Amino acid sequence: CYIQNCPLGGKRAALDLDVRKCLPCGPGGKGRCFGPSICCGDELGCFVGTAEALRCQEENYLPSPCQSGQKPCGSGGRCAAAGICCSPDGCLADPSCHDEAAFSQ
């Protein structure tokens, strides 16, 4: 499950465990899921609501929490690609996400 929308028991347990990276997605598996319909990678940019992001729906059914991206940004989001901040609800342009170390992988 995405850490922001895990069931309470799962989210509480997440504080004690290492949060894993969300499922890989996109061409060649080079992206990471950021939400049920969002797949982003530093070389790919972001796919929102496209075939490349279909695999990201599987994450909703996995019990352990996941989080993609290194650097927090926006309102509960993480840097997903150059200049892009994503949360499970969507993506926005964010100049703080231009640092290469902030990308998804």
Swiss-Prot record:
GO terms for molecular function: neurohypophyseal hormone activity; neuropeptide hormone activity; oxytocin receptor binding; V1A vasopressin receptor binding. Its main location: secreted. Keywords: Amidation, Cleavage on pair of basic residues, Disulfide bond, Hormone, Secreted. It is found in: Secreted. GO terms for cellular component: extracellular space; secretory granule. The modification Glycine amide is found at G9. Transmembrane segments: none annotated. InterPro entries: Neurhyp_horm, Neurhyp_horm_dom_sf, Neurohypophysial_hormone_CS. PANTHER family: NEUROPHYSIN, OXYTOCIN-NEUROPHYSIN 1. 'GKR' has been placed at positions 10-12 by homology with the complete sequence of the other precursors. Neurophysin 1 specifically binds oxytocin. Oxytocin causes contraction of the smooth muscle of the uterus and of the mammary gland. Acts by binding to oxytocin receptor (OXTR). Interacts with oxytocin receptor (Ki=1.5 nM). Interacts with vasopressin V1aR/AVPR1A (Ki=37 nM), V1bR/AVPR1B (Ki=222 nM), and V2R/AVPR2 receptors (Ki=823 nM). Belongs to the vasopressin/oxytocin family. This is Oxytocin-neurophysin 1.
